[in-house]
Amino acid sequence: MESRLPKPSGLKKPQMPIKTVLPTDRIRAGLGGGAAGAGAFNVNANQTYCGNLLPPLSRDLNNLPQVLERRGGGARAASPEPMKLGHRAKLRRSRSACDINELRGNKRTAAAPSLPSIPSKVSRLGGALTVSSQRLVRPAAPSSITATAVKRPPVTRPAPRAAGGAAAKKPAGTGAAASSGAAAAAPKRIAPYDFKARFHDLLEKHKVLKTKYEKQTEDMGELESMPQQLEETQNKLIETESSLKNTQSDNECLQRQVKQHTAKIETITSTLGRTKEELSELQAIHEKVKTEHAALSTEVVHLRQRTEELLRCNEQQAAELETCKEQLFQSNMERKELHNTVMDLRGNIRVFCRIRPPLESEENRMCCTWTYHDESTVELQSIDAQAKSKMGQQIFSFDQVFHPLSSQSDIFEMVSPLIQSALDGYNICIFAYGQTGSGKTYTMDGVPESVGVIPRTVDLLFDSIRGYRNLGWEYEIKATFLEIYNEVLYDLLSNEQKDMEIRMAKNNKNDIYVSNITEETVLDPNHLRHLMHTAKMNRATASTAGNERSSRSHAVTKLELIGRHAEKQEISVGSINLVDLAGSESPKTSTRMTETKNINRSLSELTNVILALLQKQDHIPYRNSKLTHLLMPSLGGNSKTLMFINVSPFQDCFQESVKSLRFAASVNSCKMTKAKRNRYLNNSVANSSTQSNNSGSFDK
């Protein structure tokens, strides 16, 4: 006979202080091992257990939920619908009223947590706060010998949800089968009168619950340290946030740096692209140059071979060139000797006669009869019958006769061999003699349209010097200009009044020089022409009966030529004296008596010197006048002399023309000693330098 326990609704609730924490784990542990057919019950979140004391059985029974569902065992089948409070008659008394394994709680809405999230170490206690969303499952019935079912705390499992959001219900058709299966597997119930077995069962449950309670107490102790851990966690969070801000600022800096580096990388990339393009171009150029280098290398090999051949040929040609230079030098020396031999055969003193043509303003003047038999003979006859019968036929022979139609170039062509002798180291003297207005200055100087002997000599000298430079000769030209006016010497290159005298050279009795004279080293033809123009402007001239601008002094231009051959250590010294004599004039017709007397006296002394040389007298009166003293080396010394005799073609000049022609004929018949070449070799170089440095030296 089954005994029935008092109805749970009749039990009173305990009046003890209630804690705010629900020990759901205790219930969950007791209900966790229920069978598949075990039910669940709804747990009110406000229901709690007392402190550390376990409630008695009656209190446990009084704390049962108001809504219970009885699952039958054996042949009893449980109703699929939950029981309601109003149907108390339907509640069947179980075999063990204390068996709470058959209890199943209803779901409730979980309250929102009031605390922030907690660390993972207390996550296992989270079920206490979210128990409303879980369901209690009855553990499987134990199979003890006494067939006493041990009540265990319920185990929380996630509550299944139906499609409509409510708990899923079993279909009605399967309820009987499930009840029959559960009845077959259900444990044997304790008899209501077996208080000992029930006591042992409750004692065993008490031990289990006590163990779980102790465990929950430990867990609660751990939960008490959670606020401190939370504060520490919040501090760590603040530190982490500060570190995060710093990291973010660092990240921003790094991002800016990344942008800068990205820009740099882009720039470098573009530069790299251009560099690659340039590299490709340079590689193409390199390949081209390499190809050219290979071709040039081959060419270099051939050129080296060719160079070696040319070097050998050059050595041979150099030896031949030295031989040719020596032969050329010797040939040049032979040419000089032969040239001057021919000049000596022609005579050391030569006379050229020139008859000037009448000017346009002189067409009304009567001319004498001039007959040219050949190039060296001229016949002069007067148109006056009385003079013609008295003087008879006048025939004169000279080295060369120039008729009025002869040009300046024709005359200089006969003079140029003497200029060549001066370059070879000989002393040359060229002077013009004749009456006033006979054309002496025109022959020596000329006019800009038709230059005379002196300007042409300058051009020939510098042209010849350039040619001699190829033969190894270097020449230096020194020039002096002076005039003899009224037997006084004047320097035409200086406006100062100087005391100038003609003196004998110490090392050579045949040489003379003029003291205190200005000597200029000529660098080019223009420089020499400038000096000649200065001298011409300083020369004394005056208007006479025979010439509007007559030279009233004897002008002497001296050019000293010093040639040096460095290889042969040879020095050649030559000189050219170009003399423009003043015109002779009858004192009776002259208005300048003193000038005329001095001019005629110097010309008369020149005639006496020529006659003394012609008669080979022991004493030659060179010192009787400044002119003859200055021309002493040219007349009787080491010199080649050329005299121009200039005559006028007019009848009124017939007497003076005859006198001039006779004087020239007497000069042409003179025999002078052979001129010697001024040549210095080796040790004589120093001596020649000393001689050439004598101030204004004439005719070395």
From Swiss-Prot:
Which key words are in the record? ATP-binding, Cell cycle, Cell division, Coiled coil, Cytoplasm, Cytoskeleton, Hydrolase, Meiosis, Microtubule, Mitosis, Motor protein, Nucleotide-binding, Phosphoprotein
Q: Where is this region: Disordered?
A: 141-185, 681-700
Please tell me one Gene Ontology term that the record gives under cellular component.
centrosome
Query: Where does the record place the Kinesin motor domain?
Result: 348-670
Give the main EC class.
Answer: hydrolase
A single Gene Ontology MF term assigned here is: minus-end-directed microtubule motor activity
> Which parts of this chain are annotated as the region Required for minus-end directionality?
664-668
Query: Per the record, where are the segments of Low complexity compositional bias?
Result: 149-185
Question: Where, subcellularly, is it found?
Answer: Cytoplasm, Cytoskeleton
**Which SMART domains did the record assign?**
KISc
Chain positions with Phosphoserine modification: S94, S96
In Pfam terms, one family for this protein is Kinesin
Q: Which reaction does it catalyse?
A: ATP + H2O = ADP + phosphate + H(+)
The residues that hold ATP are G434, Q435, T436, G437, S438, G439, K440, T441
Specify where it is mainly localized.
cytoplasm
**Gene Ontology biological-process annotations:** cell division; chromosome segregation; distributive segregation; meiotic spindle assembly; meiotic spindle organization; microtubule bundle formation; minus-end directed microtubule sliding; mitotic centrosome separation
**PANTHER family attached to this UniProt entry:** KINESIN-LIKE PROTEIN KLP-3, PROTEIN CLARET SEGREGATIONAL
- Known function: Minus-end-directed microtubule-based motor protein. Has ATPase activity. Required for normal chromosomal segregation in meiosis in females, and in early mitotic divisions of the embryo.
Identification of the protein by name: Protein claret segregational
Its ancestry begins with: Eukaryota, Metazoa, Ecdysozoa, Arthropoda, Hexapoda
